[in-house]
Regions:
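Positively charged n-region of N-terminal signal peptides that target proteins for export
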Residues: 1-4
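Bacterial N-terminal signal peptides
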Residues: 6-17
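N-terminal leader/linker segments that initiate helical-solenoid repeat arrays
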Residues: 18-83
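Helix-start (N-cap) detector for alpha-helical repeat units in TPR-like alpha-solenoids
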Residues: 24, 61, 113-114, 157-158, ...
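Short coil/linker segments at helix-helix boundaries
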Residues: 34, 42-45, 69-111, 118-148, ...
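Solenoid-like repeat scaffolds
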Residues: 51-56, 200, 239, 280
């Protein structure tokens, strides 16, 4: 009996696949850094190679949401570059959504934040490609994905970034839940969280589109300095009554420092910051080229 057990132990340590090694933190970090550099094809290749290495649901979920993230960003940038048709993009986005959904079902810890977010991102892009009516139809599901992402990790900036766009672009009551004031608060929350992460060295690059979307939402709201001071002060009660991180982010301006200027003046400063920063770089990624183009258009 003991000899049989010893033989099984020896077999497990010598035959590939019988014991699954854990994915190391260095491997996760490499994948995430490649993502930040928009090297998504490389990310997908590495993830494919690690599929047989994952040990347990948490690691498998980590592979899945990272695959969904890479797939989504590949699709998004290929659409912008004119390298992918909208029909093909819709098919691929459906698969991306399914991948993120699988990650959300099996993951634990902080992983659901990313899983829910990338499922929502794929859903949002599908709605955008299909037109206004489909975007309205998907809005509630997208908001729920963003809410779940924020619940899983309140310090994760992405759901607030997308919520800022969602609440800005949707019509308000009674058609939908669009709200320009909430859009600004969501965008400001995303920028502040990103600034904290960037300053702490948790992300290697600035997400310039965060600042552009905040500027866009400020311009759309268009409050004067005096009105800002008065109405933002009135948000405090709503912030205190909010029960979840996502709801509190809707009134985030009540609890953060706001520049003593109008919405338009702050938006102009943000756009100038983005334009000057990107124009000073020797080489821009496709994503940053798009962001610079958007910033210039809004600054006109």
């Amino acid at each position: 009996m003991h000899h049989r057990l010893a033989a099984l132990v020896l077999l497990a340590t010598t035959v590939p696949g019988l014991i699954t090694a854990q994915i190391t933190s260095e491997q996760w970090n490499e994948i995430d850094l490649l993502h930040e550099r928009d090297r998504h094809a490389e990310v997908l290749s590495i993830l494919e190679g690690l599929e047989g290495t994952a040990s347990g649901d948490t690691e498998r979920a980590g592979l899945l949401w990272r695959r969904a993230r890479a797939e989504f960003n590949q699709i998004d940038l290929a659409l912008y570059a004119g390298e992918l048709s909208e029909t093909d993009a819709m098919d691929r986005l459906a698969q991306t959504q399914a991948t993120a959904d699988e990650a959300a079902r099996m993951s634990s810890g902080s992983a659901p934040a990313q899983a829910h977010f990338w499922r929502g991102a794929a859903r949002a892009k599908q709605g955008e490609l299909q037109g206004v009516l489909n975007a309205l139809f998907m809005a509630d599901d997208l908001r729920e994905d963003l809410r779940l992402s924020a619940e899983a990790d309140p310090e994760y900036s992405n759901p607030y970034y997308v919520a800022g766009q969602l609440y800005q672009r949707l019509p308000g009551f009674p058609i939908s839940f669009g709200d320009g004031d909430a859009a600004v608060s969501f965008s400001r929350r995303a920028v502040d969280l990103h600034e904290e992460a960037y300053s702490a060295g948790e992300v290697p690059l600035r997400y310039w589109d965060y600042y552009v979307r905040l500027a866009e939402n400020l311009n759309s709201r268009g409050w004067s300095q005096r009105r800002r001071e008065r109405l933002i002060a009135n948000m405090s009660e709503d912030y205190s009554a909010a029960e979840t991180p996502f709801e509190r982010a809707m009134y985030y301006e009540a609890v953060t420092d706001i520049p003593d200027q109008s919405d338009a003046a702050e938006a102009a400063e943000l756009l100038n910051f983005v334009i000057e920063s990107l124009e000073s770089q020797d080489e821009l990624s496709l994503r940053d080229e798009r962001t610079l183009s958007d910033a210039r258009e809004l600054a006109r």
